[in-house]
């Protein structure tokens, strides 16, 4: 069935910033999608169009992107009469109309809002759940429930503390099901809250953008120590492992790294890529650390390559790859990392997200589906991770409704699949091999 009407509006994300929401109507009803927004953004990401009118929302309005949907994209898609199940055809048309390399004409936030809504409408048109429609688009006969990576300690650009590294995550890989993984994650989270409260006081249990705690600690090792203690207190030492998102591009300075970048600048404390790599290796040795995201700057290629070759853990590219099939080719060739972070708004369309995922998987990489720090109540990525069979998702701590919206949707999907539900568990890096 073709599109009857498309209408975009400005709504608010979880940080109180405007973002784009799109309503798409077919004869089957209304399909709504909202677009997320990141805080630590890679320089190679598709352009998120903001108004830059300082008199309105401090320049962060998205009325231009909304206008592009309502005045240009909507009439074009309606007049073409394309069936909503033809995701690639519709996405291609929008990309051709935009015509720029990084979606700077309409904005990735405009194109993605429509693309997500089309995908939801396509599922309804076929009379199947969204995750099944996505699996069909990706050519996957089976679907898999992911291991959740809960970001329970926040630092970096997501928090007002001194921590340089951005996210410290727990992954309940030893769970038997997604439902059990949620319970384990929640129990560790509450134990962590008590550990932090006892050690640093009640103020230290305030939460950051993604629902994790942001205690005022300086040493990244201290964050890992807190996780180790909380996991042990919860009684899950054999079931929970640790992941990190360093977001090192945020503290890259003249070829070196500043682990105290929130203090006044002092080049004498900068460390070399090799010293930083040694720090990670010491973490891997002392803690159950199995995944490190963005350990180096997005252009520090040699450091990435060297590190990935010498550690046995998952090395995730985010700022390095920005979910862009064109940016993935080089790290695949150079073996710079071994896992893609998949964020739909970095590339700006469902079709290109699927292409990026397939390219990574076909080269033996893992894929981790991810939210952004500025989120909405939209649950698209929950269905996406199941349909793409990536086996892992990070969408914050088990706290704040915009995070739980995704986790709760995954619980519903597992329930709906019943006896057919498969949980990635310890095979989260390559869940197809069970």
Swiss-Prot record:
UniProt entry tagged with the keyword Metal-binding: yes
Entry keyword Transferase: no
Comment on bound cofactor: Binds two Mg(2+) per subunit. Required for catalysis and for stabilizing the dimer.
GO BP annotations listed: glycolytic process
Binding positions (Mg(2+) 1): 40
Principal subcellular localisation of the protein: cytoplasm
Record PROSITE patterns: ENOLASE (PS00164)
Pathway where it operates: Carbohydrate degradation; glycolysis; pyruvate from D-glyceraldehyde 3-phosphate: step 4/5
Pfam families, per database record: Enolase_C, Enolase_N
Annotated catalysed reactions: (2R)-2-phosphoglycerate = phosphoenolpyruvate + H2O
Active site feature: 210
Binding site for substrate: 158, 167, 293, 318, 370-373, 394
GO function terms (MF aspect): magnesium ion binding; phosphopyruvate hydratase activity
Positions with a binding annotation for Mg(2+) 2: 245, 293, 318
InterPro entries the UniProt entry points to: Enolase, Enolase-like_C_sf, Enolase-like_N, Enolase_C, Enolase_CS, Enolase_N
Cofactor(s) in the UniProt record: Mg(2+)
Location in or out of the cell: Cytoplasm
GO (cellular component) term, any one: phosphopyruvate hydratase complex
Alphabetical UniProt keywords: Cytoplasm, Glycolysis, Lyase, Magnesium, Metal-binding
Subunit structure: Homodimer.
PANTHER family (alphabetical): ALPHA-ENOLASE (PTHR11902:SF12), ENOLASE (PTHR11902)
Family: Belongs to the enolase family.
Protein name: Alpha-enolase
